[in-house]
Amino acid sequence: MTLLVPFDGSDLAEAALRRAREFASYRDEAVVALTVVPEDESFAEERGWIEPGEPYDPEAVCTEFELRIAEIDDDVTFRCEHPPPSEHPTATTIDNVTQTIRRVAAELDVSIIFVGSENAGRVSMPVSSVGGPLSTDAKYDVHIVRRVE
């Protein structure tokens, strides 16, 4: 089995990665950090991956996160995915990111997803978090990390 950490470079994603590694040591499971990088430039700006007006290179984002993951823990496997455009006209970028995470989780036979999010899982689900939609899938457990410490 595998533990999966959706990684967007935020402090909470780093905290989720550290918690997943701690948990993995008790269960002897592999940890995969997954960065989902859509073509949506505004999504990259909202996440702080690029500054407004800065050229957006999704491959450069993948490379940057791969290096960060290796600095945090070189035993973690890094994976970067680019979601295809949705066939549904009302789908948001978050929907595409969530679908990509679910697909990878199924492919890797994930036992637990560790999500770093300030607002995932609350009664009202914001559209900016993948935590809420991921927590509805019973194929795996979800550990939501809300604090960095």
Q: What are these model-predicted stretches?
A:
Residues 2-47:
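Small/aliphatic-rich secondary-structure junction motif
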Residues 16, 97-98, 127:
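Amphipathic coiled-coil/heptad-repeat helices and related helical stalk/stem segments
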Residues 21, 102, 132:
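Active-site phosphate/pyrophosphate- and oxyanion-stabilizing loops and adjacent acidic/basic residues
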Residues 23, 68-72, 133, 137:
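Alpha-helical structural signal in soluble globular domains
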Residues 29-30, 74, 110, 140:
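Short glycine/serine/threonine/alanine-rich loop segments
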Residues 32-34, 81, 114, 143:
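Hydrophobic/aromatic beta-strand patches that form the interior of the parallel beta-sheet core
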Residues 40-113, 123, 148:
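Charged, low-complexity cytosolic intrinsically disordered regulatory segments
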Residues 107, 111-149:
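Gly/Ser-rich helix-loop-strand patches that form or flank binding pockets
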